[in-house]
Amino acid sequence: MTKVTPTSLADLIRRPIVTEKATLLLENNQYVFEVDPRATKPQIKAAIEELFEVKVTGISTSNMPIKKKRIGKFIGHKAQYKRATVTLAPEFTINLFPEV
């Protein structure tokens, strides 16, 4: 396992994923994040616990496939990314939607 410095922990977690399915998972205290494709589960756990000051009980990851994208006559593709579903201990929550 590679050594992770605190400055690189924030670079592992790219953004929270807010979809209908991810919103339903919030009821089970599960949060979905887009992470660096090279990140491992222990690195993701350390990053989430450090950034949000919570206790992680489980992580499942999946590599999302590359999808073709067509713009006019040109065919390109969307970048591949890794999705991590993080389960927190019952007493912890992450505030993804701060009050305005």
Swiss-Prot record:
Database matches in Pfam families: Ribosomal_L23 (PF00276)
Coiled coil start-end: none
GO BP annotation list: translation
GO molecular function terms noted in the UniProt entry: rRNA binding; structural constituent of ribosome
InterPro entries named among the record's database cross-references: Nucleotide-bd_a/b_plait_sf, Ribosomal_uL23-like, Ribosomal_uL23/eL15/eS24_sf, Ribosomal_uL23_CS
Keywords attached to this entry: Ribonucleoprotein, Ribosomal protein, RNA-binding, rRNA-binding
Superkingdom field: Bacteria
Record GO cellular component, one term: ribonucleoprotein complex
Family: Belongs to the universal ribosomal protein uL23 family.
Assembly: Part of the 50S ribosomal subunit. Contacts protein L29, and trigger factor when it is bound to the ribosome.
Task performed by this protein: One of the early assembly proteins it binds 23S rRNA. One of the proteins that surrounds the polypeptide exit tunnel on the outside of the ribosome. Forms the main docking site for trigger factor binding to the ribosome.
Protein name: Large ribosomal subunit protein uL23
Organism: Acaryochloris marina (strain MBIC 11017)
Lineage: Bacteria, Bacillati, Cyanobacteriota, Cyanophyceae, Acaryochloridales
Gene this chain is encoded by: rplW
